[in-house]
């Protein structure tokens, strides 16, 4: 029996419901809804064509655009719905270029997952952590967050950007 692994004290449902950060939960739910609306409006196909056009048929330039656009967008849009939305865009770009989508997908992942560290609203973990800090009486301003987030993000993205391309290119 696994009963010995359970805590001795009982947790009341009411206590659990009080501990939930509903503001953060509502923000994340809203983000997912907006992204779904964008997808249904046909903007995904439009974005594929725009990115393909900007890259001019050059895979490295297209990869670069995807990475750095993802960094900037993920700084303000949660990276989970952004990545979910952009995966079909990247697939469309790869198809238009006639290439395997692997390097472009990894570029998306580098930009989106690391770009979310630029701002307090760029990643679910940042939103949740700031909500927890606020609930405990500590306010973290966007400026305070970004003084650490910007240099960390730039160093991490540059490293990932170069390494993904080098591994893809077979060096």
Language model: regions and residue ranges:
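Hydrophobic transmembrane alpha-helices of multi-pass solute/ion transporters
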Residues: 1-60
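Hydrophobic core of alpha-helical transmembrane segments in multi-pass integral membrane proteins
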Residues: 1-2, 157-163
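Small-residue-rich segments of transmembrane alpha-helices in multi-pass membrane proteins
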Residues: 19-34, 88, 92-96, 151-158
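C-terminal TM-helix exit segments that contain a strictly Trp-centered aromatic cap at the helix terminus
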Residues: 35, 119, 163-165
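Membrane-interfacial helix-loop connectors
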Residues: 40-138
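Interfacial loop-to-transmembrane junctions
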Residues: 131-155
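Juxtamembrane boundary at the C-terminal end of a transmembrane helix
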Residues: 161-171
């Amino acid at each position: 029996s696994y009963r010995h692994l359970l805590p001795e004290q009982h947790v009341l449902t009411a206590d659990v419901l009080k501990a939930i950060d509903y503001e953060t939960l509502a923000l994340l739910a809203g983000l997912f809804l907006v992204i779904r609306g964008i997808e249904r409006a046909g903007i995904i196909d439009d974005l594929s064509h725009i990115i393909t056009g900007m890259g001019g048929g050059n895979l490295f330039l297209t990869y670069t655009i995807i990475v750095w656009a993802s960094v900037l967008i993920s700084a303000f849009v949660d990276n989970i719905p952004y990545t979910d939305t952009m995966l079909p865009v990247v697939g469309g770009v790869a198809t238009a270029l006639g290439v395997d989508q692997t390097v472009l997908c990894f570029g998306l992942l580098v930009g989106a997952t690391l770009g979310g560290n630029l701002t307090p609203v760029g990643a679910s973990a940042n939103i949740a952590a700031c909500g927890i800090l606020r609930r405990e009486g500590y306010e973290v301003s966007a400026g305070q967050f970004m003084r650490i987030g910007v240099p960390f993000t730039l160093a991490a993205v540059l490293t990932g950007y170069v390494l993904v391309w080098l591994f893809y290119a077979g060096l």
